[in-house]
A protein has these predicted regions:
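An N-terminal hydrophobic leader/cap segment in hydrolases
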Residues: 1-39, 49
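Short alpha-helix in the alpha/beta-hydrolase fold that links the catalytic acid
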Residues: 76, 214, 228-237
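Catalytic nucleophile-loop/oxyanion-hole region of alpha/beta-hydrolase
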Residues: 95-128
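Hydrolase active-site cap/lid region
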Residues: 144-198
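Short beta-strand/loop motif that positions the catalytic acidic residue
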Residues: 211-213, 218-220, 224
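Acidic catalytic loop of the alpha/beta-hydrolase fold
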Residues: 223-227, 254-255
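Catalytic histidine-centered segment of alpha/beta-hydrolase-like enzymes
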Residues: 251-265
């Protein structure tokens, strides 16, 4: 389990572009994208792109999930672009166009996101307004990053189907394979800490939102059988301050935007307009 999480089966950008729901997002792939490379604190280089929306001061940074690429965020980009936002996409550490490396399920990726936020502000102006949207591990990455962020830094967050902690997610995986969860979950946590150098709370959105004052919209599909809906429930309950939650009855994992597109757009657009 630890190996599968830290060394995921990667999808290529080319594969995701080919298999994307082009008919659902007409015109998005025609948007002009300005590529960027960002050298991080440890020398690692992150690849991404920006679709500027005229002179807009509103930016959305999109974070993709485990094993995916920035194309995994494309399905949300056009919705925000139509609302007047410039769109920033990037490949998470070890994914997409980046050099392969260990995935830490949000522990290091959350620090990367902070550097990307700073890069966007330094490039496009300290007066821009940044919001964040993530799905699955992308949502978890954002929520873990809130330990470094305040309401003055980020307008609001849209978190779609995050795990409450990798420990809980690992426990679900163990239970799904009919193994004793109460015995093996501590073993899983030990392996992640000793062999992969990742502490339990470093991979726990539920732990970090306890001090987060940024408004958050939590989304989850009721039919998500990969990251079960209770994960969002736990984070929602732990989060202090302003928060909202919506469950999509027909939504599967990270696919509510396709499983219930009209309702998804209605909920998100309404939230965005109320929090701009």
């Amino acid at each position: 389990m630890g190996y599968l999480l830290t060394k995921p089966k990667y999808k290529t950008r080319e594969f995701l572009i080919k298999t994307a729901h082009h008919e659902e997002w007409p015109g998005y792939f025609d948007l002009k994208k300005e590529p960027f490379e960002l050298k991080l604190r440890d020398g690692y280089i992150i690849n991404g792109d920006v679709s500027l929306n005229g002179d807009s001061k509103k930016f959305f940074i999109l974070c993709h999930g485990h094993g995916s690429t920035r194309e995994g965020s494309t399905k949300y980009g056009l919705m925000y672009f139509k609302l007047g936002y410039s769109i920033v996409r990037y490949d998470q550490r070890g994914h997409g166009d980046n050099v392969r490396c260990k995935c830490t399920m949000g522990a290091n990726e959350s620090k990367d996101l902070i550097e990307i936020i700073n890069y966007v502000k330094n490039t496009y102006g300290q007066d821009i307004k940044i919001s964040l949207h993530g799905a699955s591990m992308g949502a978890a990455t954002i929520l873990i990053a809130t330990r470094y962020l305040k309401k003055d830094d980020i307008k609001f967050i849209v978190a779609d189907c995050p795990y409450s902690s990798v420990s809980n997610f690992g426990g679900d995986f163990i239970k799904m394979h009919h193994q004793p969860r109460f015995l093996l979950t501590p073993v899983f946590n030990f392996i992640m800490r000793v062999f992969f150098g990742i502490k339990k709370n470093d991979m726990s959105p539920e732990f970090h939102v306890k001090t987060c004052d940024i408004p958050i919209l939590f989304l989850h599909g009721a039919k998500d059988d990969f990251i079960l809906p209770y994960h969002s429930d736990r984070i929602f309950k732990a989060k202090i301050g302003e928060k909202e939650q919506h469950i999509f009855p027909n939504g599967t994992h990270a696919n509510s935007v396709f499983d219930d597109p009209e309702e998804y757009e209605r909920v998100v657009v309404d939230y965005v307009k109320r929090h701009e």
